[in-house]
Amino acid sequence: MKTQQVVFRVRVFFASVALLVLGIVLLEPGACAQTPTPIAPPSAPRPVQDPGQQLIDQQREATRQRRLAEPPAQISVAPQGGGTSLNIPLDTPVDQIPEPGPTFRVRQIVLTGPGGQPLVRTVVSQSTLDAITAAFTGHDIGSHRLNVLLQRLTNAYVSAGYVTTRAVLGPQNIGAGMLTVVIQMGRIEAFMVNGKPIHRLATNEPSAGGGRLTDAGYQNAFPSGPGDSLRLSDIDQGVAQINRLRRNQASVQVLPGQTVGDSVVAISNPPGDRTYYTLGVDNYGAQSTGVTRYQAGVEADNLIGLQESLSLNYIDSIESNALVGSFAIPWGRHTFSYTLSDSEYQQVIGTTALEYGRTLSHIFGWNYQLGRTQSDLTALDATFTWRRTDRELNNLDLDPQREAVLRVGGNWLHRFALNDAQGNITLDAGLSQGLPWFGAKHDGADAPRTDAHAQFTKFDATVAWTVPLPRLGRAAIAYRGALGGQYTNVALYGNDQLYLGGMDTIRGFRSGDIAGDRGFYLRNELAWVNVPVWHDGRIEPYMFLDAGRAERVAVPGFSTLAGVGAGLRAQWQWHSQQFSGEAMVGRQLVRPAAIGPKSTLALGTINWSF
C-alpha cells in the first residue's frame, strides 16, 4: 500500500508539471490552429548561436556541477589549551552553579585583548558577550563559576568559527570587585604544504605542492594570512579555492604554533596530474552549420604554483568552429578570470546567398565569495565583455558589430536533506548594460526599439533545483528542474539574444532552433539516481518535459518550443581515465511552422577524459 501511495504521489507531481508546461504551450497564439504563427518568413536565415559562447556556457555549467558535487572541506583542529570540561546550560542561574571553594563578589566584568588592548571586533556581537557577562555580574564567584564564565565566552567565539580563540583570566583587582577577562584571539602563525613551509622555489628545487615556481598559491587561496585571526569559515573558503582544481584534493589540519594562541595551518594535498585532456563527439549541432560536432580540450592546473587554471577548448562542425582559452586565479575570496573566444560560421540563405560571420570576444571576470557555510554559498560576480563580429554576404562586407557589455550579478547555492538524500537549489541573476565606450558601436539618438542595440539594459536569471522524491521500493528518484530567461525592451544583436532548443534549454530540438530578445524556458526531469553500479560503470535513466517561449522586439508575438522524451546517461571510470556519454530521444510537441514540421529527434554524445 505504501509503495502504491508513493507511485501515486510521483504521478500526481509529474502530472502537475505537465499541466504547467501545457499552460505555456496554450499561451502560444494559434497553438491549436492548423498553422502556428511563424517566427520569421521561411526565406529568413535561421538564427546561428555563436559556437564560442556555447563552449563558454558549457564550461560554466560544468563548473556549477562540480560545485554541487564538491564534498565538505576536511578540516581538523588539534586540541587547544585553556578549555574546561564543564558543560552547564547557558540559562542556568549563577547561584545554582555549584561552587565548592571560596568566592568573591563581582560588580563589573571587563573584556579586553592581550596587554589591555581593545577587544578585537569580530562577528561575535557585543550584545552576545554582554548577555554572558551580565549573568555573572553582581554574584559571588569562585573557581568553579569562573571556569563556567570562561567556557561560555570561549564557546561564543568557537560557535562563530574562531575555533582557536580562548577566554583567559587577566590581571585582577578583586578588592574593587572588578573581574578582567582577556580574549586571546587565535591567530594564524604560518602555512605549510605537505609538511614544508611555503616559499619561492630555488632552481631545480622540487615542489611540495605541485607548482613549478612556487607554492604561494596555497596561502593566497585563503582570505586570511599570517597574523590574522583564525576563523573556520576562512579556512573552509581556502580549501574550496584549492579544491576547485581537478588535480587537488586538499585537507587541512590546524596545529598549535610556537606561541600560545597561534596555529599553523597544515595543508595536506598530494597533487594529481598537471594536465587533463578531453575528446568528444555529439550530434547536438544546428542543421544550418552542421549536426555533428567534434570537441577537444586541455586543462592545466597549478603549473606555476598560484593555484591558477588554464584551459584551451576547440569545437568544430562542418560549417562552424570555435577556439576558447580561459585563465583563472584565486586571491582569498576573490577569483579573477580572463577568457578569449574566436569563432566563425557560415550558412546558406535561400539558394543564392552565403553568409559568413566571425566573432572575437574578450571576457574579464571577477567573483567574490560573500559567505560560505555547510549548506549555503553566496557570491557576487561581474564580467566585462568586449566583442567584435564581422560578417560577409556573398563576400561583401557588412557593418561590423562592436559591443562592450558589463554584467553585474549574484549567485546562491543551498543544499538540503530530504527523503534521506541530498537536494540543492541554485540561483543566478544579473543585470547587463551595453556601454558606449571602448570602441563600441553607438546607437543613434533616434534609433527605434526594433533596431538592434549595442547600448541596452537586460536582466537575466536562472534557478535550478534537485529535489529527492520518496523512494519507489529501492529506487531513488530525483526531480531536477530549471527555470531561466531574460528580459529587455529593445532589439538585441544575436550574441545577446536568448536561444532556445538543445540539450541545455529545451530538449527534443537542435541547438538554438529559435532566438529572441526576451523569453524564458522551463526544464523538468525525473531521474533514477541509484541504479546499481556495474564494473565501475554508472547509468542514470531519465525522462523529461521541457518548454519555452521567445520573442523578438521587431517581430511581435512569442514563438514556442515544447518537447518530451527520455534518455540515459552513462559514466565509466578506468584508472585515471573517464568515459561518459548520453543518449536521448525526444518528441517535439510544439514548434513554429517556419522551422519545419514536428519530428522525433535522437541525440547522443560520448566523451573521453584522461
What are these regions, as identified by a protein language model?
Residues 285-289, 304, 318-320, 344-350, ...:
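Gram-negative outer-membrane beta-barrel proteins
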Residues 34-285, 297, 313-322, 482-483:
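Periplasmic polypeptide-binding modules associated with outer-membrane biogenesis and secretion
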Residues 15-26:
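Bacterial N-terminal signal peptides
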Residues 254, 279-283, 296, 310-316, ...:
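Transmembrane beta-barrel strands of outer-membrane/channel proteins
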Residues 143, 228-229, 283-287, 311-316, ...:
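Outer-membrane beta-barrel domain signature
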Residues 34, 133, 447-610:
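C-terminal transmembrane beta-barrel domains of outer membrane proteins
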Residues 35-41, 207-219, 231-417, 597-609:
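Gram-negative/organellar outer-membrane beta-barrel architecture
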Residues 273, 303-309, 333-335, 371-379, ...:
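Short loop/turn motifs that connect adjacent beta-strands in outer-membrane beta-barrel proteins
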